[in-house]
Amino acid sequence: SLIQALIGSILLLALPLWKKAHGEESIQAEKKMKVLPISQTLRIPGALMTCLLFLTFCAIEVICGGWSATYMVEAKHMPANLAARATMYFYLGMALGRFLSGVAAKKLTPWQIIFISMGILGVSQTTLLVSGNNVLTMAALLMTGLGVGPLYPNFNYMTPLHFGKDVSQSVMGMQMTFASIGTIAAPALCGVLGQLLGMGIFPAYLMIFYVLTAVGIIALRRTLRQVGRLQQ
């Protein structure tokens, strides 16, 4: 309960930091929004790719939150109470990642924060994949939360910058749709694969979504650069 209270406090403290860093820009840049049909929204250069990114990194969040304890118990033979604590470390890391992202937004660009986050995620996923030590595995879960936490707010913030404020509402709507698909389908598939192959597949399954996220970021930046909308 103490850790849960700490997570809640960190998230509440992060909100004003984001408002201070980006709120004034959003207010000054308000324009009349266009509501586009789905097909037209997804034809905007880079829109489909950013939606797929929301699917993959939101999937990482929910897979870790939903299946890490089961993995620790079944594959690592950890006591259930320690496995639950390991999952709590993941959520603590995610809350801390979003808080630090709000602090860093005053000095770093969203892309710089994303690159740092992906680096942390890469280290954590590799550690999960190769570590046979329970302490290192728990540390890797904390780092996974720390790395994935900043992705959602930073990609969300960049949507009007990359696609135009007039159509950003439509793009954000699709991003939320794809995020919902990721949060529902990815953990369900993990459960099915876990029953068939054993929960030892958990680190490899997470690594697949990390690689998809990394490839998606490269593809998105390339597309945005080609159309002259890439924000540095």
Q: Model segments located where?
A:
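Helix-to-loop junctions at the C-terminal end of transmembrane segments
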Residues: G97-T109, G194-Q195
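Intracellular juxtamembrane helix-capping segments at the cytosolic ends
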Residues: P150-F163
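A late C-terminal transmembrane helix in Major Facilitator Superfamily
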Residues: F163-M199
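Symmetry-related core transmembrane helices of the 12-TM Major Facilitator Superfamily/SLC fold
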Residues: S1-P16, P203-A219
